[in-house]
Amino acid sequence: FDLLGLLKKVVSGL
């Protein structure tokens, strides 16, 4: 599970 990758995806979706 890529937590940092998921976080970046969420941030870029804002």
Curated annotation (Swiss-Prot):
The protein's job, in short, is:
Antimicrobial peptide with activity against Gram-negative and Gram-positive bacteria, as well as against fungi. Has potent hemolytic activity against erythrocytes.
The name on file for this protein is: Eumenine mastoparan-EM3
Its predominant location is secreted
Q: Which residues carry this modification: Leucine amide?
A: L14
Q: Name one GO cellular component term.
A: membrane
Compartment(s) where it occurs, according to its Swiss-Prot or TrEMBL record: Secreted; Target cell membrane
Q: In which tissues is it expressed?
A: Expressed by the venom gland.
Classification of source organism: Eukaryota, Metazoa, Ecdysozoa, Arthropoda, Hexapoda
Q: Which organism is it from?
A: Eumenes micado (Potter wasp)
